[in-house]
Amino acid sequence: MKNIRTILLAMALTTATGSMAQSDLQQQFANPPQEARPRVWWHWMNGNISKYGIKKDLEWMHRAGIAGIHVFDAGLNTPQIVPHRITYMTPEWKDCFRYAVHIADSLGMTMAIPSSPGWSNTGGPWVTPHDAMKKITWRAVRVKGGKKLTVNLPGIYTTTGHFQNVENTNSPETFSQQIGIVAVRMPDTDIDIASLNPTITVSKGEPTVAQLTDGDYSKGTRVEPDAEGNIWAQYTFEKPVTIKALSLSDGNNRSTWNSWSAPLYYRLETSNDGKTFTKVCDIPQSGTFQQTIDLPPTTARCFRVVCQLPQKDKQGEYVNLMEYNLYTTSRINFAEEKAGFTSFGDLDQYPSRPDSDVSAAGDVVVLTDKVDADGRLTWNAPRGNWVIYRFGTSLFGSRNGPASPEATGLEVDKMDREAVHKYIEHYIDLYRDASGGNIGKRGIQYLLIDSYEPGKATWTLQMPAQFERRRGYSIYPWLPVLTGVIVGSVEQSEQFLYDYRQTIGELMDESLYAEVADAAHRHGMKIYIESHENGRQMLADGISVKAKSDIPMGAMWAEKRADLSMYECDLRETSSTAHIYGKKYVAGES
């Protein structure tokens, strides 16, 4: 009986404790502690601010139970709706910001600022072209060896844009620098298709073979539907030719936010009589401005690409055909994606076909020291057919945004820690002045890196040294693989491309996220960090990126869309980061 009373007493105590805990939880939900209350993003839209409005906003948010604010300068072409527009970081703007800091502090509200004007990512008008995001570019020349050569190499591309000499940004700034000269002895089976004198016909338009195979992306031909509503481009050879790969560029690429698997935009068909065509394969839309795919060896006289989902404008459907090249030797499948020009997430689904008919690793020669200041190469070339590549770098062209015009400039190089250091110290100094020195324990207590949106840069001036330090071998003999050429073997070339992407990801992790987090801590602040948000936006590892934060952050949208599962992945990544690295708090942009 005594034991029964003891058990009943224990049960009663447990029930009472559970009831108290439930009651306590209900009370805390109704009146949450300060650390559990929401923070909000407070956008100062294009200079439409006033002290009167600042005070009203903050007092209203405080009454609503909001515990903190993240103050953004944003633009989005917002029209002026106040009598007097106040420009970013002018003395008058700083006075308003200092007033906001004072009011927020008096109300017990925490304050955060993003890592740049706008919300993505780390850029501003003080970033110089030298310190901005960059891409790798190349020009190619075919020569026959077995003699001393003097070759005037084409100049490196200086265009600001995302790929080669495609102009697709609104950045007027320029920067370019040579990386190196590398020659590759090609297999005897490698033939420039233009030398076979094919004819090019299209559904409606007037491209030339030279224009479609010259590697110049600044010139495109508008190709429209034929009478039956089909858009196509066709090479016809005098005799059957065996083709192992193709590349195609129509000026389109998958946007940063559409990283899911693309719909099928093109297909390849072949024929021997030009009348009856057989489908060879579908061609997924590229994640870059050009796509290279390998093919099963295919022999035919006619090779036709057919567009299934063309663009549309006021004049109707069309394709802006820039390049359409066929190759008689194998190329890297999804070469541009594997070279980092996009962060396509399913590369393991697109392996390159094994082929022994490739350039040997010993058939690569670095010739940088044999080129004079005018770009003239003098070289005793061994026998064989060679392609000489001139590699360079130019600006990627991304700008921070969406900020007010006065706060907009180039995005800093995310792979150059010194450049990021200069950038973030200047940025924090601006806000130290604007806040009257209130950074750290009071005033601006947090920094925030929002989701990554500036695009996929593929080069930094430190890349050769960083690559060799991390991977243990020189990058220079392998640079031609970034163009799609297979060197050594498919396995060796794919390994190099993996190493290249890995290096980009590591440099972003250490140079952007670690440096900005360190800067926040140096100045007494804590930091929120988001990473990919929707899809795979960069080559850095999201968990490693968020591990640099004090508060890892994900994002979610209250929409009914098929791709929202990617946001779930982002939230799971965020919670995983907190569990693995012992973060007390997790934030959600929602």
Kindly give the residue locations of the regions a language model identified.
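Bacterial Sec-dependent N-terminal signal peptides
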Residues: 1-25
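The substrate-binding groove and active-site-proximal loops of carbohydrate-active enzymes
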Residues: 38-50, 79-95, 122-125, 283, ...
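Catalytic domains of carbohydrate-active enzymes, especially glycoside hydrolases
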Residues: 53-74, 96-102, 442, 545, ...
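Catalytic-core region of carbohydrate-active enzymes that cleave or remodel glycosidic bonds
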Residues: 59-61, 102-105, 521, 526, ...
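Acidic/aromatic-lined carbohydrate-recognition and catalytic surfaces
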Residues: 74-195, 330-337, 344-345, 355, ...
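Aromatic-lined carbohydrate-recognition surfaces of secreted/lumenal glycan-active proteins
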Residues: 111-122, 448-451, 506-538, 590
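Substrate-binding cleft/loops of secretory-pathway carbohydrate-active enzymes
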Residues: 119-132, 451-461, 528-561
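Aromatic, loop-rich ligand-recognition surfaces of beta-strand-rich domains
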Residues: 214-279, 286-360, 451
